[in-house]
Amino acid sequence: MTGNVISADGAIALGLDFGSDSVRVLAVDCQHGTEIDTEVVYYPRWKKGLYCQAAQNQFRHHPLDYIEAMEQAIRQMVKRLSEEQRQHIVGIGVDSTGSTPAPIDEQGQVLALRPDFADNPNAMFVLWKDHTAIEEAEEINRLCRSGEFADYSRYIGGVYSSEWFWAKILHVTRADVAVREAAVSWIELCDWVPALLSGTTAPQDIQRGRCSAGHKSLWHPSWGGLPPRAFLAALDTSLVNDLDYPMFTDTYTAERPVGQITAEWAERLGLPTTVILSGGAFDCHMGAVGAGAQPYTLVKVIGTSTCDILIADDQRVGDRAIAGICGQVEGSVLPGWIGMEAGQSAFGDMYAWFSNLLSWPLHQAALTQPEWQPQLKQIESNLLASLTRAWAQNPSLDHLPVVLDWFNGRRTPNANQRLKGVITDLNLGTDAPTLFGGFIAATAFGARAIMECFEQQDIPIDNVLALGGIARKSPVIMQVCADVMNRPLQIVASDQCCALGAAIFAAVAAGAHDDVPTAQRHMACNIERTLIPDPVQVVRYQQLYQRYQQWCHTAEPHYAPVTKVIH
């Protein structure tokens, strides 16, 4: 916390949640945890599909999307507050997707904000789900396992992903000479926003978050921070010759203040100049805090993908490296505890893919009959809900297709972004609701595989929490997860836990609470309901899960990289 101690009574903290499609701002009462108001604004360029090529797995965000959406969201929400409430805003916390890094120049400006790079996707933020760096990730993994160096992937699950910091930097550096020559460093989105608002974007002034550095950047205290110069140079000399080395050494947990909002940003956002910026972290880590997570509770943040967070104590973990996950980092969730991350690369995105597939005739009809567009759009928007209801009325598992949930690769266990979705066991009687039931089961099977990855390595899971829009709005899907995992599944009573977690850290940084656990007791959200496994369905899903595992073992070798034959 800061040196200033303020009363939580009446104090308001803002949480900024930068998602894949939009930014959300949430105003929270620091004393009682009341969610006072919220606003969501979509990214305008992203909404138009600019700078993205889905077929090449390229997904980029222009920094102006973040700036414009954030400014609009905060200003619109602040206008609805009373003047007294506005003056009682004490802090802003920030979470974002990750790894979502961007190149910056000597002044700390993201390159795409410069006229010479304004429309260059390589000068923008490389979104978490961008998989253009698969080959670079494999290079990093080979070097980690070569024996030439220590295994710097040891504490990130043993597999470095194409979704992460160094793989993306390496890919862009090689693909774009102009970006390579202009960039002196790279920054994660969750670190950039607090730096932007506090005027600390110069590379030497940036406060790097423990969460992003430990989970995605190979930072670990046992080797003094980032991997040594020789390791990065062995990947590509540009990583140490063209970029600052070390890019950073120290990292900070998110309750530490980054600085005070600048006068310019206070005026632009309609906020007091006394507002404190807390450190940034990834959305799901802050979501776990907002959900009130306790040690050995698996928190599933469910959206387009999932991120699974678990907190463990150092005594139980010791010096063990937990294999197959996305990292174990002290302080990445709660200070003093080891935060562990896992996840599924596609959850809601799988359902959306299926909906888009079935909607093709609707789109064609809308082109030929424009006057039908309103009705066709309504049918499309209700499609997933209709499929879910139809399957729930007759959830037969006798002929359920077995689907592998690798439509966007696999994050956990053992990250592998080369993998593709697989649909098996179709017959002439398979209809759309039944196939959608296979998709629901697939996402639940992926969730169970993550749970077993922890438990098989003596990391117990005492409780399972689910949060996010799907968790609250889709009881059928959540019941399948409870049945497949054979665990009670607690549903958190908020769609805004990530923003709430960010607000909790802001409250601590501003001095409204002494520490994060105290702030959680006052501000974290409650459990809305608990789903209990159905013993009959548990047995039936167990048989399907075994088939799922068999298909996983059969299918994965087919996606191994092809060895190039040199003649």
UniProtKB/Swiss-Prot annotation:
It comes from Yersinia pestis bv. Antiqua (strain Antiqua). Pathway: Carbohydrate degradation; L-arabinose degradation via L-ribulose; D-xylulose 5-phosphate from L-arabinose (bacterial route): step 2/3. Its EC number is 2.7.1.16. Pfam families: FGGY_C. It comes from the Bacteria. Signal peptide: none annotated. Belongs to the ribulokinase family. It is an enzyme of class 2 (transferase). Coiled coil: none annotated. Transmembrane segments: none annotated. GO terms for cellular component: cytoplasm. This is Ribulokinase. GO terms for molecular function: ATP binding; D-ribulokinase activity; ribulokinase activity. Keywords: Arabinose catabolism, ATP-binding, Carbohydrate metabolism, Kinase, Nucleotide-binding, Transferase. PANTHER family: FGGY CARBOHYDRATE KINASE DOMAIN-CONTAINING PROTEIN, RIBULOKINASE. SUPFAM superfamilies: Actin-like ATPase domain (SSF53067). It catalyses: D-ribulose + ATP = D-ribulose 5-phosphate + ADP + H(+); L-ribulose + ATP = L-ribulose 5-phosphate + ADP + H(+). One of its GO terms (biological process) is L-arabinose catabolic process to xylulose 5-phosphate. InterPro entries: ATPase_NBD (IPR043129), FGGY_C (IPR018485), Ribulokinase (IPR005929).
